[in-house]
Amino acid sequence: MSMKYLMLLFAAMIIRSFANSGNAIETTLSEITNTTTDIPAIRLCGPEGNGYCFHGICIHARDIDGMYCRCSHGYTGIRCQHVVLVDYQRSEKPNTTTSYIPSPGIVLVLLVSIIMCCLLFVYRFTRRTNKLPLQDMVVP
């Protein structure tokens, strides 16, 4: 918004300089902003737009200086008169890429289970070898 006011101030200074033909310029930003009205870029049409849009809201856009329709979901066209048969943007497709990614919790449980199985195997193997008599372990 400040750029808009600076441009208005600059334009007013130039106009005054031509009008005053060399006199001192005493225009301030408050003088310019008090005289200008701020028109919104987009506003509702009002009574003249009743019935203009078939399936949507009538909007008056300052840039195009005319009525414009903002269509409801499922409709398209200048006056929202056409039905959209297939809406690809809003159709829900199964997200296959994320369904194959395991969660960190599952990976952690699987890793702990593998470590526990390895420790159990080592414990049983060392227990068996400790129970054998020394004679069986010595080769003649």
Swiss-Prot record:
Q: Which residues form the signal peptide?
A: 1-18
Tell me the ranges covered by the EGF-like domain, including all copies. 41-81
Keywords assigned by UniProt? Disulfide bond, Early protein, EGF-like domain, Glycoprotein, Growth factor, Host membrane, Host-virus interaction, Membrane, Secreted, Signal, Transmembrane, Transmembrane helix
Membrane-crossing residue ranges in chain numbering: 101-121
InterPro entries, A to Z: EGF-like_dom, GF_C11R
Q: Which SUPFAM superfamilies match?
A: EGF/Laminin
Could you give a GO molecular-function term held by this entry? Answer: epidermal growth factor receptor binding
Task: State what induces this protein.
Answer: Expressed in the early phase of the viral replicative cycle.
Keyword Glycoprotein tagged:
yes
* Stated role: Stimulates cellular proliferation (hyperplasia)and mobility around infected cells to promote rapid and efficient spread of infection. This effect is beneficial for virus replication in vivo, because poxviruses replicate possibly better in proliferating cells than in quiescent cells. Acts by binding host EGFR, inducing its dimerization, autophosphorylation and leading to activation of several cellular pathways regulating cell proliferation or cell survival.
What's the protein called, per UniProt?
Pro-variola growth factor
Task: Kindly list the organism's lineage.
Answer: Viruses, Varidnaviria, Bamfordvirae, Nucleocytoviricota, Pokkesviricetes
Q: Which gene encodes it?
A: OPG019
